[in-house]
């Protein structure tokens, strides 16, 4: 079951492009949605992994692992929650990734997504807080 257009995301501190994200109707995704509101939340990602094709941040909360699965190939725009609480957003296709995680959601349009993340990372290299990439996240699900 899919929660269409559950959130919208702007990539980078000064990002203006709105990206729609569909989320899965599972306990982990619903718990994350509970933390969000209709106001934009500035979300920091402290890990940028060009080789792994993802940005990540550890999130707190009691997330169930009921929907955890093994995913052989990861696609651009997919979001996963790992057992240690790491939330990953993949900005590149990663064939043979073989990850075990809970699918959270996916960007509905991935055209230009890779470049947007890379540009946000490059423009944020001197961040005083050590953040690699910022995301503005707004809950759009009613």
Please state what every model-predicted region is.
Residues 12, 22-24, 134-140:
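A structural detector for beta-sheet-dominated domains
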Residues 14, 24-26, 48:
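Histidine- and/or cysteine-centered catalytic micro-motif in compact active-site loops
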Residues 18-25, 102-108:
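Short amphipathic beta-strand/extended segments with alternating polar/hydrophobic composition
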Residues 1-17:
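N-terminal low-complexity, Pro/Thr/Ser-rich intrinsically disordered segments
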Residues 15-22, 63, 67:
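Second-shell loop/turn segments in exported
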Residues 26-33:
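Extracytoplasmic/secreted envelope proteins and their assembly/folding machinery
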Residues 33, 37-142:
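Glycine-rich active-site loops that engage anionic ligands at enzyme catalytic sites
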């Amino acid at each position: 079951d899919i929660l269409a257009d559950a959130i919208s995301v702007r990539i980078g501190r000064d990002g203006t492009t709105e990206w729609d994200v569909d989320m899965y109707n599972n306990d982990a995704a619903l718990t994350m949605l509970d933390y969000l509101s209709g106001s934009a939340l500035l979300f920091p990602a402290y890990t940028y992994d060009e080789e792994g094709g993802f940005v990540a941040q550890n999130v707190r909360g009691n997330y169930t692992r009921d929907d955890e699965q093994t995913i052989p190939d990861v696609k651009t725009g997919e979001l996963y929650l790992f057992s240690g609480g790491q939330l990953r957003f993949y900005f590149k296709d990663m064939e043979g990734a073989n990850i075990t995680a809970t699918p959270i959601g996916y960007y509905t349009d991935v055209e230009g997504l890779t470049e947007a993340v890379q540009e946000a990372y490059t423009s944020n290299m001197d961040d005083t807080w050590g953040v690699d990439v910022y995301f503005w996240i707004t809950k759009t699900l009613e």
